[in-house]
Amino acid sequence: MKTLLLTLVVVTIVCLDLGYTRTCLISPSSTPQTCPNGQDICFLKAQCDKFCSIRGPVIEQGCVATCPQFRSNYRSLLCCTTDNCNH
């Protein structure tokens, strides 16, 4: 009986996903994607280049381990730690 119980516990541990994985949007029109291990922060970055006045800001979204540093050509930068928060 103890062997059966121990076997069930081991199988349960092996089959379960023990680590929680974050999901973030990778592009404005994408469905949420699972982030790689260690990248638990979702981000949304809007930055301008020389064509910003014509086509608008360039949007970049995804998963990161640390929030990117804000730069002068960014219109906005959002870092968040809940699923799909970077929309």
Curated annotation (Swiss-Prot):
Result of altering residue 57 to A: No important change in inhibition of muscle and neuronal receptors
GO MF annotation list: acetylcholine receptor inhibitor activity; ion channel regulator activity; toxin activity
Record's keyword terms, sorted: Acetylcholine receptor inhibiting toxin, Disulfide bond, Ion channel impairing toxin, Neurotoxin, Postsynaptic neurotoxin, Secreted, Signal, Toxin
Mutation effect (residue 55 to A): Loss of inhibition of neuronal and muscle receptors
Residue stretches spanning the membrane: none
Major subcellular location class: secreted
InterPro entries in alphabetical order: Snake_3FTx, Snake_toxin-like_sf, Snake_toxin_con_site, Toxin_cobra-type
Domain of life: Eukaryota
Subcellular location per the Swiss-Prot or TrEMBL entry: Secreted
Annotated disulfide bonds: 24-42, 35-63, 48-52, 67-79, 80-85
Coiled-coil blocks: none
Tissue: Expressed by the venom gland.
Family to which this protein belongs: Belongs to the three-finger toxin family. Long-chain subfamily. Kappa-neurotoxin sub-subfamily.
Functional note: Postsynaptic neurotoxin that binds and inhibits neuronal nicotinic acetylcholine receptors (nAChR) with high affinity (IC(50)<100 nM). Is a selective, and slowly reversible antagonist of alpha-3/CHRNA3-containing and some alpha-4/CHRNA4-containing AChRs.
Complexes and interactors: Homodimer and heterodimer; non-covalently linked.
Additional information: Shows very low activity towards muscle nicotinic acetylcholine receptors (IC=~10 uM).
Official protein name in the record: Kappa-bungarotoxin
Originating species: Bungarus multicinctus
Taxonomic classification: Eukaryota, Metazoa, Chordata, Craniata, Vertebrata
